[in-house]
Amino acid sequence: MKLICRQSDLSSGLSLVSRAVSSRPTHPVLGNVLLEADADKNYLRLTAFDLSLGIQSSFTADVQQSGRITLPAKLLNDIVSRLPDGDITLAIDPDGDAGDSHLTTITSESGRFQIRGLDADDFPALPTVEGVKPLLLPVATLNEGLRGALFAASTDETKQVLTGVHIKGSGDSLEFAATDGHRLAVVEAPTQIENDEGEAVITGSDLADFAVTIPARALRELERMVASQGNSDLVSLVVNDTQVIFELGDQRLTSRKLEGAYPAYDQLIPRQFSRTVTMERKRLITSLERVSVLADQKNNLVTFTLQSPGNQLQLAVEAQDLGHGEESMGAEIIGEGGQIAFNIKYLMDGLKALPSNDIQMQLNEGNQPVIFTPLGGLKMTYLVMPVRLVN
């Protein structure tokens, strides 16, 4: 194998795929990146796979001799990322000694490095899905859905299906939902986009029976992949009984599906409320950021006091043996006043994801779920469970 490529192309490709390399590989080759050079098509393809998540990326290179090799992911990335911008050469001597048959030489204008790899034939193939019509999703749909829901997925691996985001068709939109048992985020992201002939790329019939739960880890990598793309660019998605595959240009992401029925989250959302508070989102966030400095690290609570006659919302925190902090802000309050407490982190996560400046908080008496929604813009619901106050 011998090729010449740009340092920037190889470095960005390695940064992307290396995120699918296992930190504790069950086999040495899973700690490596697979490099495949094709002289006929003049491209270099990079692949990483931890048997659950796989990422593949290709780019143009001057391939003088085709070949395949796997190289240690972290070592290769550390070297290439530090090389100066410009052309670099990767070469393997096929006639080398038996012990050096996988020795790869990396040459740049600054110097020369040699890395010993492992046989490419030992690297597991990425899963494929055959005979399934791909769903073409606008990047804007994925960006909106993931930005509004991904943060609420559970990080507790024992909760299995809750460590993912549930995505399902809803009319001409995709509904993204995530919950960790303490909060729930639901986003309805429109999919309407037309091709050059003015025809809808995706229709309600395409989404009618679509539903899948995908690990949050895989979707975070997808979010990074599409971040630099245009909103009208299309991502291909195919799903079978066990796998999901996203493709965008020369990039591909594969992931296992999460098995099991996702909770019926619609039933958790109250339909009627006794109190409604309308307020400015950014003002609330900055007030929370200030008072959170004094929040008790053990429970991380903030108490909201609704002062209905005066249309004031008071925020208060208490840290035992440290002190007390409070702030007030204007708010439009409909219904009786009262007190309610929240975990500050859960509250802040949701407020930062809401897409509009003016938001509404809807609540009932006692410790029933509280709903936050944006006024205008994207249709999003953020449900958070309040914390019981002990007098």
From Swiss-Prot:
Functional note: Confers DNA tethering and processivity to DNA polymerases and other proteins. Acts as a clamp, forming a ring around DNA (a reaction catalyzed by the clamp-loading complex) which diffuses in an ATP-independent manner freely and bidirectionally along dsDNA. Initially characterized for its ability to contact the catalytic subunit of DNA polymerase III (Pol III), a complex, multichain enzyme responsible for most of the replicative synthesis in bacteria; Pol III exhibits 3'-5' exonuclease proofreading activity.
Gene name tied to this protein: dnaN
Gene3D superfamilies per the UniProt record, alphabetical: 3.70.10.10, DNA Polymerase III, subunit A, domain 2
Domain of life of the native organism: Bacteria
Name its GO BP terms in alphabetical order: DNA strand elongation involved in DNA replication
The organism's taxonomic lineage, starting at the top = Bacteria, Bacillati, Cyanobacteriota, Cyanophyceae, Synechococcales
- SUPFAM superfamilies, from UniProt? DNA clamp
Q: Name one GO cellular component term.
A: DNA polymerase III complex
* Keywords, alphabetical: Cytoplasm, DNA replication, DNA-binding, DNA-directed DNA polymerase, Nucleotidyltransferase, Transferase
Q: Which family does it belong to?
A: Belongs to the beta sliding clamp family.
Assembly and partners are described as: Forms a ring-shaped head-to-tail homodimer around DNA which binds and tethers DNA polymerases and other proteins to the DNA. The DNA replisome complex has a single clamp-loading complex (3 tau and 1 each of delta, delta', psi and chi subunits) which binds 3 Pol III cores (1 core on the leading strand and 2 on the lagging strand) each with a beta sliding clamp dimer. Additional proteins in the replisome are other copies of gamma, psi and chi, Ssb, DNA helicase and RNA primase.
Q: In terms of one coarse class, where is the protein primarily found?
A: cytoplasm
Q: Where in the cell is it found?
A: Cytoplasm
Q: Which organism is it from?
A: Synechocystis sp. (strain ATCC 27184 / PCC 6803 / Kazusa)
What name does this protein carry?
A: Beta sliding clamp
